Amino acid sequence: MEVQLGLGRVYPRPPSKTYRGAFQNLFQSVREVIQNPGPRHPEAASAAPPGARLQQQQETSPPQQQQQQQGEDGSPQAQSRGPTGYLALDEEQQPSQQQSALECHPESGCVPEPGAAAAASKGLQQQPPAPSDEDDSAVPSTLSLLGPTFPGLSSCSADLKDILSEAGTMQLLQQQQQEAVSEGSSSGRAREAAGAPTSSKDSYLGGTSTISDSAKELCKAVSVSMGLGVETLEHLSPGEQLRGDCMYAPLLGGPPAVRPTPCAPLAECKGSLLDDSADKGTEEPAEYTPFKGSYTQGLEGESLGCSGSSEAGSSGTLELPSTLSLYKSGALEEAASYQSRDYYNFPLALAGPPPPPLPPHPHARIKLENPLDYGSSWAAAAAQCRFGDLASLHGGGATGPGSGSPSAAAASSWHTLFTAEEGQLYGPCGGGGGGTSEAGAVTPYGYSRPPQGLAGQEGDFPAPDVWYPSGVVSRVPYPSPSCVKSEMGPWMESYSGPYGDVRLETARDHVLPIDYYFPPQKTCLICGDEASGCHYGALTCGSCKVFFKRAAEGKQKYLCASRNDCTIDKFRRKNCPSCRLRKCYEAGMTLGARKLKKLGNLKLQEEGEASSATSPTEESSQKLTVSHIEGYECQPIFLNVLEAIEPGVVCAGHDNNQPDSFAALLSSLNELGERQLVHVVKWAKALPGFRNLHVDDQMAVIQYSWMGLMVFAMGWRSFTNVNSRMLYFAPDLVFNEYRMHKSRMYSQCVRMRHLSQEFGWLQITPQEFLCMKALLLFSIIPVDGLKNQKFFDELRMNYIKELDRIIACKRKNPTSCSRRFYQLTKLLDSVQPIARELHQFTFDLLIKSHMVSVDFPEMMAEIISVQVPKILSGKVKPIYFHTQ
């Protein structure tokens, strides 16, 4: 298929080449001018590929070229009938070479005489002539490429002249073109009379096979005027594969791109070429900025005073030849191969690359690249990697088309890049195959990568992080501190560690660290370090084992400087001894566990050795041993566990600066109730023996007893903090007489304050309070019973015995112990009526909550609406110690 090129050539696209990038036609035309001075006729131009023309030209000597030219029609004036012409872009030729370059020959790419071109324009396509290269100031602009015979040059409107900076510039161009015509005609006739050779390979290319400086400058000027980067053009070698061409074309399958008016690009090319000095730098000159801005304004809607081909008939308009096309046709042969490519419209490309962050518009990304970024081994693929999308590495939000998988990237225009050292895969940011990145970074496996910019100005990528495939299981941290050792069964014997039996099969040697290939190690339940064994009833490390022994046996009381929620891990386990000891108790560590284990092993050994009946002395020794075990399970160990798991202070979040109202006070109480309910669940799970209950029984016991537990704990806080004068619900929510009346629950508040005063009248100790609170958890059950009612009764009886032991430790008189036990159990019974009244109040409030504007958290609303009616209906009843 033939594609029309920018300067009027007809070029057949070879099947082994693909050209990608913006303005490929224009750059390809310049390349053809420099490297391949082709034949005069379009038929001859399409007969051979450009590489063959260049080779044919190099093999042809200057005398042979002259003979071939004269042998075509027998007259040196035959050159005036050539249909095409080219620019002589070499500014470093000798004066003799400059004069000979003005005369065109059939096998060379030099420029024909302007007069001859005007004569040939009657029947053939018009092509722009080139001015003389004698003066550096006469570097041809884009308007001069049109030639003096262009019909719109003389009739250009005043608006166009204003855009071209000033009207005097147009007159200067016309004067230079007339001088070039006169000088070219006279010098051409003189050379024809003398019989001098008119063109040669050395005179055209400057004696070398490299691209001339003027050609590079022209490419750079056009690139600058089009809003492209010039850094890539400075380091290009003459090879075909290192051409950093970029292509701006309409999206395939989408609406056709609107062609911009030709005046603006002409004005940019004119200004950029005329203002360019002889000493060319590697950076973009500052003179290009005004022309960029003027063209950007023109794109926004200014009337440029000229029109395209649709207004060709109007006077005062500037028309361009139909072959000067900067757009890629949508019907090219490779259209099917680039369905996923995202092209851009031409006006946005000329406006320059937008500042980051990039807009989400599909045509808002500018494709820039530097072939030197890929090294010598990437020379062949440098022009193919069009979608580097380096803006995404800077944190931009642009994402490219295609999926995140490597196969999908290969099918589209995205290419995978590998670093030389690591060999890590960098894929595109997939729209459907992987996860999204927070900062728009490239994520090949769906994992987000920390955003980071380029390592240097050269475009090198930073050292890649270790990315694991999706099939690799990450290491699990140590278990939650709520994992409490069961006192009823030796679960540590079959403990497989927090990781379970994890086997990694999809890992790669160069990706995963070496510790992933070892069997998972058992970790300490306290700090997460490597466990050395089961110590004091829990799987711990040696450090936590020694710490627990010293802390549990010692008399020192540890206090947390924070809120009893410090992080205990391998590196911060020594920061807070109080939280570390609490975590030890939560894990089920007890001083008696070690003694019990030794005595149990001794008992098994004795049973294996003894095959006959035991003697009376042995029976007495066994009884002594059992009594010793029972005596060892004394109250200090049990109390240490209760003290360690006691919840800390919980705030309600009430705003005391606002005036007290019924809705505000009750809403704060409901919020406080939900927060305390979370702590009650954690506390109950840490109680010794609670986890041995059936799971349904655990949930039922907590949902039925939460109100009594909160009331009992609030009475204790009121006694210890405000001496039972007020209700100390939370540090930021204390009820006085006014708030009791304002909350419309004055009678319930009076009964709760009376309960708080009972702690003072009975002189309840902290040890008694802790044991009574634990016993209160097992004091309300359904009438139909629990799923494992027998074990519940045994567990409740054990806590009653513990309370009796606590009482017996303080008193030696059995009569006083019985009286004290009676007083404490009566106090526990008094909590149940108060809790029932509060159940009724909260249930009625929940029904009217929408009318009184009282907020109920979701968890509280669910428990009140589901479990409280069972208590009010009598399906769930409390267990009383005394007859009511």
Swiss-Prot record:
The keyword Chloroplast does not apply. Pfam families: Androgen_recep, Hormone_recep, zf-C4. Residues 516-883 are annotated as: Interaction with LPXN. 17beta-hydroxy-5alpha-androstan-3-one binds at residues 670, 717, 842. Residues 33-145, 174-207, 275-294 are annotated as: Disordered. One of its GO terms (molecular function) is zinc ion binding. Residues 556-883 are annotated as: Interaction with CCAR1. It comes from the Eukaryota. The record marks 862 as: Interaction with coactivator FXXLF and FXXFY motifs. InterPro entries: Andrgn_rcpt, NHR-like_dom_sf, Nucl_hrmn_rcpt_lig-bd, Nuclear_hormone_rcpt_NR3, Nuclear_hrmn_rcpt, Znf_hrmn_rcpt, Znf_NHR/GATA. Keywords: Cytoplasm, DNA-binding, Isopeptide bond, Lipid-binding, Lipoprotein, Metal-binding, Nucleus, Palmitate, Phosphoprotein, Receptor, Steroid-binding, Transcription, Transcription regulation, Ubl conjugation, Zinc, Zinc-finger. One of its GO terms (biological process) is positive regulation of cell population proliferation. Residues 589-883 are annotated as: Interaction with KAT7. The record marks 685 as: Interaction with coactivator LXXL and FXXFY motifs. Phosphorylated in prostate cancer cells in response to several growth factors including EGF. Phosphorylation is induced by c-Src kinase (CSK). Tyr-499 is one of the major phosphorylation sites and an increase in phosphorylation and Src kinase activity is associated with prostate cancer progression. Phosphorylation by TNK2 enhances the DNA-binding and transcriptional activity. Phosphorylation at Ser-61 by CDK9 regulates AR promoter selectivity and cell growth. Sumoylated on Lys-367 (major) and Lys-485. Ubiquitinated. Deubiquitinated by USP26. 'Lys-6' and 'Lys-27'-linked polyubiquitination by RNF6 modulates AR transcriptional activity and specificity. Its main location: nucleus. Residues 1-522 are annotated as: Modulating. A zinc finger (NR C4-type) spans 524-544, 560-584. Residues 55-79, 174-196 have a biased composition (Low complexity). Steroid hormone receptors are ligand-activated transcription factors that regulate eukaryotic gene expression and affect cellular proliferation and differentiation in target tissues. Transcription factor activity is modulated by bound coactivator and corepressor proteins like ZBTB7A that recruits NCOR1 and NCOR2 to the androgen response elements/ARE on target genes, negatively regulating androgen receptor signaling and androgen-induced cell proliferation. Transcription activation is also down-regulated by NR0B2. Activated, but not phosphorylated, by HIPK3 and ZIPK/DAPK3. Binds DNA as a homodimer. Part of a ternary complex containing AR, EFCAB6/DJBP and PARK7. Interacts with HIPK3 and NR0B2 in the presence of androgen. The ligand binding domain interacts with KAT7/HBO1 in the presence of dihydrotestosterone. Interacts with EFCAB6/DJBP, PQBP1, RANBP9, RBAK, SPDEF, SRA1, TGFB1I1 and RREB1. Interacts with ZMIZ1/ZIMP10 and ZMIZ2/ZMIP7 which both enhance its transactivation activity. Interacts with SLC30A9 and RAD54L2/ARIP4. Interacts with MACROD1 (via macro domain). In the absence of ligand, steroid hormone receptors are thought to be weakly associated with nuclear components; hormone binding greatly increases receptor affinity. The hormone-receptor complex appears to recognize discrete DNA sequences upstream of transcriptional start sites. This is Androgen receptor.
